From Swiss-Prot:
Part of the 50S ribosomal subunit. Belongs to the universal ribosomal protein uL16 family. It comes from the Bacteria. One of its GO terms (molecular function) is structural constituent of ribosome. Binds 23S rRNA and is also seen to make contacts with the A and possibly P site tRNAs. Pfam families: Ribosomal_L16 (PF00252). This is Large ribosomal subunit protein uL16. It comes from Synechocystis sp. (strain ATCC 27184 / PCC 6803 / Kazusa).
Length: 139
């Protein structure tokens, strides 16, 4: 699973997800891509599950690029802990995804194979997504 090797600070504030993705919204590497259509935090486990689903389907052919990286720590308090006594310890990592963000790219396979691989990956993610290709226009 993906996570940063080291960070400047152990804990982060939650922040807000407003507006569309300003960067990372165009196809850069592959011919087909999976684009987010709603905002969400995507965990490193979900990214890994989607990657596995795609690689199992396309087998040896094709190349996959993961365009999102979980760099935000999410903290949790232990169960049945009283209020106070500070912020919890980091439990897992998330990638902040805004609408329009390209999450996965794929090349070296036919459109039918790419469409099905992206569909399988999208089932592992908690958001609505859109399949885009170099031929089509996208947000």
């Amino acid at each position: 699973m993906l996570s940063p090797r080291r960070t400047k600070f152990r804990k982060q504030q939650r922040g807000r997800m407003r507006g569309l993705a300003e960067r990372g919204s165009t196809l850069n590497f592959g011919d087909y891509a999976l684009q987010a259509t709603e905002p969400c935090w995507i965990t490193s486990r979900q990214i890994e599950a989607a990657r596995r689903a795609m690689t199992r389907y396309i087998r040896r052919g094709g190349k996959i690029w993961i365009r999102i990286f979980p760099d935000k720590p999410v903290t949790m308090r232990p169960a049945e802990t009283r209020m106070g006594s500070g912020k919890g310890s980091p439990e897992y990592w998330v990638a902040v995804v805004k609408p329009g963000r390209v999450m996965f790219e794929l090349a070296g396979v036919s459109e039918e194979v790419a469409r099905e691989a992206m569909r399988l990956a999208a089932q592992k993610l908690p958001i609505k997504t859109k399949f885009i290709s170099r031929q089509e226009d996208y947000i």
